[in-house]
A protein has these predicted regions:
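A short beta-strand-turn-helix
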Residues: 34-53
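Positively charged n-region of N-terminal signal peptides that target proteins for export
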Residues: 1-4
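Short, acidic, Ser/Thr-enriched surface-loop or helix-capping motifs
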Residues: 24, 37-38, 115, 145-146
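Thiol-/selenol-based redox modules, centered on thioredoxin-like
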Residues: 137-179
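Structural microenvironment flanking redox-active thiols in thiol-disulfide oxidoreductases
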Residues: 63, 68-109, 116-120
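Sec/Tat signal peptide C-region and signal peptidase I cleavage site
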Residues: 16-23
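Bacterial N-terminal signal peptides
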Residues: 7-16
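Short active-site neighborhood of thiol/selenol oxidoreductases, capturing the structured segment around
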Residues: 47-68
């Protein structure tokens, strides 16, 4: 009985620890990352700390319908976001080659970050198993990170068609300064 109780307690602690690691909240420090982008550069969140706010628009998979709509929104109406002193990226668990081809196909003038080992997606808690040919990819969530490196907002109900407008509205709401 004692062993069973101990095992149950350890299992419960493991579950709680797993949830806490993936359950980021507004006000938490954003997990640092170093990811290669579609433009060939490596980007580290820590390079922006104290300098600029950062937007990470996580998306499931390049060349799928919702992701294509979101990328087109950000590419075609990115001027709305560029008014703010912010670095913005789309991020997925696709390879950098897939991210580059996807960005080029939709005239994205912003970097698309690649997280093929899924470590950063796991740190942000965005991974989900969609099954079938999609498999384990990121959910469509957008993280707004302040200059202080803390999460200022999380959007878990992203609307791909109005992504650029919604990001710009949230940046204004968060009082991110203009350039």
């Amino acid at each position: 009985m004692k062993r069973l109780l101990t095992a149950m307690m350890l299992f419960g602690l493991a579950l709680v620890a797993g949830v806490q690691a993936a359950d980021l909240q507004v006000g938490d420090m954003a997990p640092d990352f170093s990811l290669k982008a579609s433009d060939g550069h490596m980007y580290k969140l820590s390079d922006f700390k104290g300098k600029r706010a950062v937007v990470l628009a996580w998306y499931p998979k390049a060349f799928t319908s919702g992701c294509t709509i979101e990328c087109k929104s950000l590419a075609e109406k990115g001027d709305l976001i560029k008014k703010f002193d912010v670095a913005y990226f789309m991020v997925s668990v696709d390879t950098v080659e897939q991210a580059k081809a996807f960005g080029e196909a939709h005239n994205a003038d912003f970097p698309l970050l690649s997280d093929p080992d899924k470590k950063t997606a796991d740190a942000y808690g965005t991974l989900r198993d969609y099954g079938g040919s999609i498999g384990v990819v990121s959910q469509r969530w957008t993280f707004y990170i302040g200059k202080d490196g803390r999460i200022a907002a999380i959007d878990k109900a992203v609307k791909p068609a109005t992504s650029a407008e919604d990001v710009a509205a949230r940046l204004a709401e968060l009082k991110i300064p203009a350039k």
